[in-house]
Amino acid sequence: MNHRRSSIVLLILSILSPVTLSIRYELLSGHTKCISEEIHANAMTIGKYSIINPHEDHPLPSSHKVTVRVTSPQGTAYHESDGVESGQFSFVAVETGDYISCFSAVDHKPETTLIIDFDWRTGIHTKDWSNVAKKSQVETMEFEVKKLFETVNGIHDEMFYLRDREEEMHNLNIATNSKMAWLSFVSLAVCLSVAGLQFWHLKTFFQKKKLI
């Protein structure tokens, strides 16, 4: 029970606290890098990516192109772009699991280093609250209530997700314990059989030697 409460508290803190949603990394030409994100079913996800221009006063060179592929845990492609400098994707996850975004830089000689800026948001983080406030011009209190409502919905969905994961782990533990019990029984039976065979062999040996 205490462990469950701790998990819920950590979940609430992770949702309410600020998170870093943008990453920037280097990618060598001819190489591929993949980033995975655990997303649960029915969650909205949005991604934006772009190649940083090393020379702002000039257009990106032809070597600065990437192929992007976003796939589900079962391998379903949600986004594919070939030879692009930037792009974006959005979808609602159908299944729960690790979704993978892979970036492949075009092969180029001499080898070039690309800097990729990637922003991947999931769940309530797909909401851009600053734009919502500017576009609707709502009162401060109404805006805060709406934001809190969305946060509560996110917590609600995450709690159901954790409950399902906990149930899966519980069923897995039961199945594992059953297999271990069966394996222990088989091991005991094998040991007793071997001991019986050894006893019979020794008895036969001593009888032949007329020691018993």
UniProtKB/Swiss-Prot annotation:
InterPro entries per UniProt: Emp24-like, GOLD_dom
Lumenal side: 23-179
Keywords attached to this entry: Coiled coil, Endoplasmic reticulum, ER-Golgi transport, Golgi apparatus, Membrane, Methylation, Protein transport, Signal, Transmembrane, Transmembrane helix, Transport
Keyword presence, Repeat: no
Motif (COPII vesicle coat-binding): 205-206
Record has Protein transport as a keyword: yes
Subcellular location: Endoplasmic reticulum membrane; Golgi apparatus, cis-Golgi network membrane; Golgi apparatus, Golgi stack membrane
Assembly behavior: Probably oligomerizes with other members of the EMP24/GP25L family. Associates with the COPI vesicle coat (coatomer). Associates with the COPII vesicle coat (coatomer).
UniProt protein name: Transmembrane emp24 domain-containing protein p24delta7
Provenance organism: Arabidopsis thaliana
